[in-house]
Amino acid sequence: MVLVNSWFNQPGVEEVVPRSTYLMVMIALFFIDTVAFIFMQLYFIYDRRQFSNCVLSLAFLSCLIYFVITVIIIQQIIEERLTSSVVQNDIAIYYLFRQMSLCILIFLALVNKVSENTKQRNLFSKKMTLCISLFFVFGGPIVAHILSSHYESYNLHIAELTNENGQVVWKASYVTIMIFMWLTLLSVNLYFNGLRYDIWNGVTVIAFCAVLYNISLLFMSRYSVSTWYISRTIEVV
């Protein structure tokens, strides 16, 4: 559906992403993360000794919050409340914070998993880990909101550069940070868990796919916008 919609809805130079495609992919990701959140919560309720599952569920919950906010932002450009360039930058800000929150929360879950496997005392207590996790779940969107177009004095500019085709593109430095974070998580997870645990095999896939679709963002300024479709399709799959 994404590929068909992308073929028949080619954007002009003023748009980077057809809004119908964006909404369709966001709904798919929202559904997937909802299922993952519920599954991890049920898994934690079944075995409360596995606190890492609770932290993993919060990682997917944070994604749900960012998805809802992103859909609201897209509606603003549909209703012509904000310009396309402003909306694209706001979406980039929330995407950056979503990626950072997801990666950091999964890393916290990994730290707890390692301590559970080795029977060693965790660096942080469960209460401290829960507080840190809740900060990223609810505090991250607040910080992203402050850095968006709602507060011009603190506005963060990620998607502000324009290529030769007149399209707004992302600053490579922010994308590089996300790639480095996911590569680090992927390496650490493979080192401690390998391919022994079903859930953590899924984390390996998530981290690997995150590296792929974030690398594809580096080519948005050089190639057509179809690169964006490929990156989002990878994330959905």
Language-model features: where?
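Individual alpha-helical transmembrane segments in multi-pass integral membrane proteins
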Residues: 1, 13-115, 201, 228-236
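Hydrophobic alpha-helical transmembrane segments and adjacent interfacial helices
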Residues: 63-71, 139-143, 208-218
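Alpha-helical transmembrane segments
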Residues: 1-5, 61, 133-141, 208
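Cytoplasmic juxtamembrane regions at transmembrane-helix boundaries
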Residues: 118-140, 199-204
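Interfacial "cap-and-anchor" motif at the non-cytosolic start of specific transmembrane alpha-helices
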Residues: 146-237
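Cytoplasmic membrane-interface regions of multi-pass membrane proteins
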Residues: 42-49, 110-126, 188-195
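Juxtamembrane "helix-exit" motif on the non-cytosolic side of transmembrane helices
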Residues: 3-15, 72-83, 143-161, 214-223
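Extracellular-loop-to-transmembrane junctions of the mid-late helices
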Residues: 16-29, 91-102, 127-183
